[in-house]
Curated annotation (Swiss-Prot):
It comes from Aliivibrio salmonicida (strain LFI1238) (Vibrio salmonicida (strain LFI1238)). It comes from the Bacteria. It catalyses: a 2,3-saturated acyl-[ACP] + NAD(+) = a (2E)-enoyl-[ACP] + NADH + H(+). It holds the Pfam family Eno-Rase_FAD_bd. Substrate binds at Y225. One of its GO terms (molecular function) is trans-2-enoyl-CoA reductase (NADH) activity. The gene is fabV. This is Enoyl-[acyl-carrier-protein] reductase [NADH].
Amino acid sequence: MIIKPRIRGFICTTTHPVGCEHNVKEQIALTKAQGPIANAPKRVLVVGSSSGYGLSSRITAAFGGGASTIGVFFEKAATEKKTGTAGWYNSAAFDKFAKEEGLYSKSLNGDAFSDEAKQKTIDLIKEDLGQIDMVVYSLASPVRKMPETGEVIRSSLKPIGNTYTATAVDTNKDAIIEASVEPATEQEIQDTITVMGGEDWELWMSALSDAGVLADGCKTVAYSYIGTELTWPIYWDGALGKAKMDLDRAATTLNEKLSATGGTANVAVLKSVVTQASSAIPVMPLYIAMVFKKMREEGVHEGCQEQILRMFSQRLYREDGSAPEVDDQNRLRLDDWELREDIQKHCRELWPQVTTENLKDLTDYVEYKEEFLKLFGFGVDGVDYDVDVNPLVEFDVADI
């Protein structure tokens, strides 16, 4: 079929398999250009490995460190009439390129919150790898089905206490608007912590530990975002922030447990990037368009891949083997460049000046839209979008 982008809200409902493959190839090339990572882990599990920071982690481990990787994700394959999800095509491309390099790559597709996902992963590790040296926890799901009851819990992107009103951009109309979001109820806050907090990370680590598949010195990392005062009301000070604080709680508990065998657990605070997850958060697209422009001008812009490469090589797996720098909460801070005072001051001063008319001049909004479409495989250099492509792409993946 000839596949063109179809946007609905903040989701593109079509995806391009060739474009997605090109994206993955580009990220692999970037990783290889950095050279091999010293002291890199050799057997890595990535929970939530099909897009964004999770995919970058898998690529970095495999192509930067030569690791055998297992990826867990929840994606949809294509049918003859409907394209698969971008994460499906990303994972297929990763698997193809890993195998071409002679790297071990296995993937499990299904609900990572389920007990079955944990058990199947453990069985696979025992069968193929014996143990693992690193666990990356990178789930960004809006819902969680509770294994014991089958109840489906939903998270909320809402402030706490007061209605939040701010300048935002309507990405469908390319217009500056005023966005208002009602505050979360106490139940919605608790539900958001249940879905996006640290409990499932702990359950994964406990299951892996109890099964004896964590090697001595195993490191685990989960990803977070704190942001700045421009986004705090909807993010860090909102329901989502409470969930991210729960990740910090989980990291402390896990770090104590893993330290007995020389391992570590950290939350890594990353910079804002264009992902399906961030595009759903009010004010984030406008903030990202603003901060990206300034960071590019300052020569400190990073995408997902650059961020994770820096986390591996300059934080967790340093050449001299030294412990990474952390903040007072034991977090790895990769948002350090974004939070530079000159960059944030620029954004604070620019925010009230942006209008629909000057949006494209004052910010990198055009690039934001291009990067958003790229997530789904569109607008990628070197891809002919008028060519008939087969949406059905198979690879080495087992259903959970």
